[in-house]
Design a protein with these regions (language model features):
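Hydrophobic h-region of N-terminal signal peptides that target proteins for export
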Residues: 3-12
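Interdomain signal-transducing alpha-helical coiled-coil linkers
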Residues: 160, 164, 367-370, 374
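Metallo-beta-lactamase
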Residues: 251, 302, 384, 461
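Amphipathic alpha-helical coiled-coil segments
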Residues: 48-63, 181, 185-206, 215, ...
Length: 497
């Protein structure tokens, strides 16, 4: 890409970050690519983005684990009681008797959620031991070798089925958002990088202006002695020298502030010397097609997944409000149990155990409360649908505007480079003309201002080119240079300590 090769400022690039002893401490010389890579690797913003990804990953893992069989064991070992309790006799009288016993029990429990129906199926086995002290006491074992239990809601909302639809979208959304935020870290690095370049250029401009102002002031003093220039022009040049001193002080303070901002963002101690991108634009596109960018964005960006998730959550709320009109639950248990004074006997001559329960709750008079809840959910769904349509239009519009801005930026950069060259030539010509002839101070001031603005605009347009490019990458999650999706090894990232 010849355009960026021609338009870059004459600074030497380096293949790797290097530290050189300059001034009071070491200096870290960075190219733009190295700055972006460092920001993605060690900036605070990148660490926050990774933390959010890890949170979403483990939430996804917890959801998947919730669908798998769960095995649990519970026990009480021991349970000792020595107390008096009330006892009702056969004739209806109540007396207090002394209880003195030692109990042990344990159970193994396996449960599985049934997502198609929303119920829970479990298998349980347990053993209880009781030792009664005192006269007539002894040992007693009670076993439950196996018991099968089903708990099933009927006509209710199937939360498992809805979560099975929504949770994968949440995780996919988190992955896409992480990739977008990674590109946004690059965008922030680009802005801070070029802000420092621009601040350094402003210092250079201020020093050049001060040097030229002092030269012109000396020339004006000589001309004043010869009577070829007015006292007013000499005073104006003296004022220009003072203003140039002030501008240099301000620009140096601004450069230090920009230096600190980039160092803090990259989490480095050394002074940073940014290298203006020279030749790094080779291979990047000069023109992007809106339909192609939009297609990649709709496929990869978190926005598309967010729209589907929000629509599904709105449907879920409506379904839950409708299911809240009545509640019916089925509970069924089948198994075997045995009792004996010895452990082996507790597993012989087993007796069957069956429990069936159907519980229901039907509102008779609620004064329209449940109907109101359903209407609220339906209204909220309509609001969400309207918001999603509006946001989809804005999403497409923003991509169109950004694509047009990027496509126009190459021409803007070419114009800025040419304007910088012309403004510098005009400035030099005016300075030499003043030294050897006569030219108004207004012309010199105007040439100085135009030269300064053109040089800064040249850097700004180069900044916009890179910023727009990475902004399109962050939206489409597509590497336009390599022609492939922007991806990451999520499993490796989240498991990195």
């Amino acid at each position: 890409m010849i355009l960026l090769l021609v338009c870059t400022l004459p600074l030497q690039s380096t293949p790797r970050p290097t530290r050189e002893g300059m001034g009071e401490g070491p200096t870290l010389r960075l190219t733009l690519d190295e700055c972006i890579a460092m920001a993605r690797r060690q900036s605070v913003d990148a660490a926050v983005d990774l933390g959010e990804l890890k949170s979403a990953y483990w939430q996804w893992r917890s959801y998947k684990a919730d669908l798998l069989p769960e095995v649990s064991f519970s026990a009480t070992a021991p349970s000792y009681n020595k107390r008096y309790t009330s006892y009702q006799q056969a004739d209806g009288g109540v007396s207090y008797v002394r209880n003195d016993y030692l109990g042990l029990n344990g159970s193994l429990y396996v449960s599985q959620k049934i997502w198609p129906t929303g119920g829970t199926l479990s298998v349980e086995t347990s053993l209880d031991f009781l030792h009664q002290s005192g006269s007539g006491g002894g040992n007693q074992f009670m076993s439950m070798p196996v018991a099968l239990t089903l708990s099933q809601p009927i006509f209710g909302i199937n939360h498992l089925k809805w979560n099975r639809r929504i949770e994968p979208l949440k995780y996919r959304e988190a992955q896409a958002r992480f990739l977008t935020e990674t590109e946004q870290v690059a965008m922030k690095a680009i802005s801070l990088f070029f802000n420092l370049i621009l601040a350094g250029e402003q210092v250079g401009i201020a020093r050049q202006n001060l040097q030229k102002a002092e030269e012109l002031y000396k020339v004006a003093q000589a001309k004043r002695e010869m009577g070829t220039i007015s006292e007013n022009d000499v005073l104006q040049l003296k004022l220009d020298v003072l203003n140039a001193h002030s501008a240099l002080t301000d620009s140096e303070s601004n450069r230090q502030a920009r230096q600190f901002a980039l160092r803090a963002f990259l989490d480095v101690e050394a002074e940073i010397e940014p290298i203006v991108p020279e030749g790094q634009g080779v291979g990047l596109p000069l023109h992007l097609d809106y339909e192609e960018v939009l297609s990649h964005a709709l496929q990869n960006n978190a926005f598309a997944t967010t729209m589907r998730r929000r629509q599904m959550e709105a449907d879920y709320s409506v379904a839950a409000a409708k299911a809240n009109r009545r509640s019916i639950n089925l509970y069924a248990q089948m198994g075997y149990t045995g009792m004996a004074d010895k452990l082996g006997g507790a597993y012989r001559d087993l007796l069957s155990k069956e429990v069936i329960q159907v519980g229901f709750s039907v509102p008779i008079l609620d004064w329209g409360k449940r109907k109101g809840q359903r209407k609220v959910a339906e209204s909220n769904r309509e609001i969400v649908q309207g918001q999603l349509r509006q946001q989809a239009q804005e999403f497409r519009q923003n991509i169109f505007i950004l694509t047009e801005q990027f496509n126009n930026q190459a021409e803007q950069l070419r114009i800025a480079c040419e304007a910088d060259t012309i403004a510098q030539k005009r400035y030099n010509t005016n300075i030499e003309t003043f030294k050897i002839g006569s030219i108004s101070m207004l012309d010199i001031s105007d040439a100085t201002r135009a030269k300064d603005e053109a040089r800064q605009n040249r850097i700004s347009q180069l900044h916009y080119y890179w910023y727009y490019y990475y902004q399109l990458r962050s939206i489409a999650l597509w590497d336009f240079e390599k022609g492939c999706d922007i991806t990451a090894d999520i499993e490796k990232l989240v498991k990195t300590p």
